[in-house]
């Protein structure tokens, strides 16, 4: 096993998780803030806003999970070794 490839795989796995969580993290914070503003403006639409928010948060979180899967593939099932 080449130590340079192993080291690069560990660094790439770290970048994969880190970069894959930045965008969804910002998006989730923005979406939650806007949902709270929407509920404050229209309390009668709370159920619809909450349902839409939870669905969109699940889609955003899936992006982070994809980054984690790529990182795990690089660490444990590395195609470059």
UniProtKB/Swiss-Prot annotation:
Could you tell me the keywords of this UniProt record? ATP synthesis, CF(0), Hydrogen ion transport, Ion transport, Lipid-binding, Membrane, Plastid, Transmembrane, Transmembrane helix, Transport
Broad class of the protein's primary localization: plastid
| NCBIfam families documented for this protein | ATP_synt_c (TIGR01260), PRK07354.1 (NF005608)
Query: How does the annotation summarize its subunit structure?
Result: F-type ATPases have 2 components, F(1) - the catalytic core - and F(0) - the membrane proton channel. F(1) has five subunits: alpha(3), beta(3), gamma(1), delta(1), epsilon(1). F(0) has four main subunits: a(1), b(1), b'(1) and c(10-14). The alpha and beta chains form an alternating ring which encloses part of the gamma chain. F(1) is attached to F(0) by a central stalk formed by the gamma and epsilon chains, while a peripheral stalk is formed by the delta, b and b' chains.
> Where does this protein have coiled-coil stretches?
none
State whether keyword Transmembrane helix applies: yes
Q: Where in the cell is it found?
A: Plastid membrane
Q: Where are the transmembrane segments?
A: 3-23, 57-77
**What is a single cellular component term in the Gene Ontology annotation?**
proton-transporting ATP synthase complex
Its membrane topology is listed as:
Multi-pass membrane protein
The task this protein performs is described as: F(1)F(0) ATP synthase produces ATP from ADP in the presence of a proton or sodium gradient. F-type ATPases consist of two structural domains, F(1) containing the extramembraneous catalytic core and F(0) containing the membrane proton channel, linked together by a central stalk and a peripheral stalk. During catalysis, ATP synthesis in the catalytic domain of F(1) is coupled via a rotary mechanism of the central stalk subunits to proton translocation.
The cross-references to Pfam families, in alphabetical order and at most eight, read: ATP-synt_C
A single Gene Ontology molecular function, please? Answer: lipid binding
Return the protein name: ATP synthase subunit C, plastid
Native source species: Cuscuta gronovii
Site feature Reversibly protonated during proton transport, where = 61
Which InterPro entries does this entry report, sorted A to Z? Answer: ATP_synth_csu_bac/chlpt, ATP_synth_F0_csu, ATP_synth_F0_csu_DDCD_BS, ATP_synth_F0_csu_sf, ATPase_proteolipid_c-like_dom, F/V-ATP_Csub_sf
UniProt family annotation:
Belongs to the ATPase C chain family.
> Keyword DNA repair, does the record have it?
no
């Amino acid at each position: 096993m080449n130590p340079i490839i192993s080291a690069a795989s560990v660094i790439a796995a770290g970048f994969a998780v880190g970069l894959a969580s930045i965008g969804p993290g910002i998006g989730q914070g923005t979406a939650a803030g806007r949902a709270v503003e929407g509920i404050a403006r229209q309390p009668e639409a709370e159920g619809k806003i909450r349902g839409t928010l939870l669905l969109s948060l699940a889609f955003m979180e899936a992006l982070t999970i994809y980054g984690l899967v790529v990182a795990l593939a690089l660490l444990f099932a590395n195609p470059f070794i």
